[in-house]
Swiss-Prot record:
Entry EC no(s): 1.3.5.2
Cofactor-binding details, from the entry: Binds 1 FMN per subunit.
The protein's required cofactors: FMN
Gene Ontology, cellular component aspect: cytoplasm; plasma membrane
Active-site residues per Swiss-Prot or TrEMBL entry: 183 (nucleophile)
Name of encoding gene: pyrD
Record's protein name: Dihydroorotate dehydrogenase (quinone)
GO molecular function: dihydroorotate dehydrogenase (quinone) activity
């Protein structure tokens, strides 16, 4: 149980602009991890083990990518009781992302809009931070996913080279790797979800992964993260392509470009990806379609709109094997982690 209830700190954080609040929180967590200060946000680890893609997850609730883009707070996040933590998205070269302001809260709907644009310090800094994790060095029961993307300045036709460079770098340090082709905030990135582009990209990744498995003596699972803004035919094409190239699983979904659920509210028309409560059903629908297309045994990580134990259970019932949270952590705080983990565990 964290020493400082989130209900006390949230008004202070929500009094700041979203990116300043995010940066302050991440800096405090980075400095406070593995010290007594960590008790301010620590939560119990709920035991609900499951095996997926050859990995043993301590429980079925993970931290989604995007919060910790530079892998600075792995140990701090592990202390919140997550069964797995995904950091990134990292690109081969450092990049500043899109101009500010680029994050917006819509508290009336428990939602966020961001157009950050893969702002990160680049692969070298990212890997240095991963290697510094004490939780990893001590073998604590938490899996680590490393999420990779392309640089904004890399032409879309050369995107594969960026993904392969990033894969080469993260492979030895990851429990699993996520290929992010679904952020709406990098120009043309979602075009990689189309049939021919996805086929070419995943073919190259599959080939490189086999080379890396031989080189490093281990086969690291590769997941692909997709958007919620897809029709059933597109989902079917993606599912077939994932299986054809031996991808180990899919993460559904990223943020949405739809604004139906927040129409008329302040900041609703800001460009970027919408996350939080309004994405829940759209994400669940894609999960249901994926489960139908992929069969009962293919690994699906469900993410999007989880703000309660009930929301997490809805993802599992839609067909997800495990889930991730992000916006819910902003609105509900660290106590959401054990709440969702316990709710899912009760399904057994």
């Amino acid at each position: 149980m964290s020493l400082i209830p989130y209900a006390l700190t949230r008004p202070f954080l929500f009094g700041m602009d979203p990116e300043s609040a995010h940066d302050l929180t991440m800096n405090l967590m980075a400095k406070g991890q593995n010290t007594l200060l960590q008790q301010a946000w620590a939560q119990p680890m709920v035991s609900d083990p499951v095996e997926l893609a050859g990995l043993k997850f301590p429980n079925r609730v993970g931290m989604a990518a995007g919060l910790d883009k530079n892998a600075r707070c792995i140990d701090a996040l592990a202390a919140m009781g997550f069964g797995f933590v995904e950091v990134g998205t990292v690109t081969p070269r450092p990049q500043p992302g899109n101009p500010k302001p680029r994050m917006f809260r819509i508290p009336e709907r428990n939602a966020l809009i961001n157009r950050l644009g893969f702002n990160n310090e680049g692969l070298d800094a990212f890997l240095s931070n991963v290697k510094r994790s004490q939780a990893r060095a001590q073998g604590k029961p938490m899996l680590l996913g490393l999420n990779i993307g392309k640089n904004a300045t890399t032409p879309i036709e050369d995107a594969t080279s960026d993904y392969l460079k990033a894969l080469d770098g993260v492979y030895p340090h990851a429990d699993y790797v996520t290929v992010n082709i679904s952020s709406p905030n990098t120009k043309n990135l979602r075009a990689l979800q189309s049939d021919e582009a996805l086929d070419a990209l995943l073919g190259a990744i599959a080939e490189r992964r086999e080379q890396l498995a031989t080189q490093h003596g281990k086969r690291v699972p590769v997941f692909v993260k997709i958007a919620p803004d897809l029709d059933e035919e597109q989902v079917g094409v993606i599912a077939a392509t994932l299986q054809r190239h031996g991808m180990d699983g899919v993460i559904a979904t990223n943020t949405t470009i739809s604004r139906e659920a927040v129409k008329g509210l302040p900041y609703a028309q800001e460009t970027g990806g919408l996350s939080g409560a309004p994405v829940l059903e759209a994400s669940n629908q894609v999960i249901r379609q994926l489960r139908s297309a992929l069969g009962s045994r293919y690994p699906i990580i469900g993410v999007g709109g989880i703000l309660s134990g009930e929301d997490a259970v809805s993802k599992i019932r839609a067909g997800a094997d495990v889930v991730q949270i992000y916006s819910g952590l902003i609105y509900r705080g660290p106590a959401l982690v054990p709440e969702t983990a316990r709710a899912i565990a009760q399904l057994r």
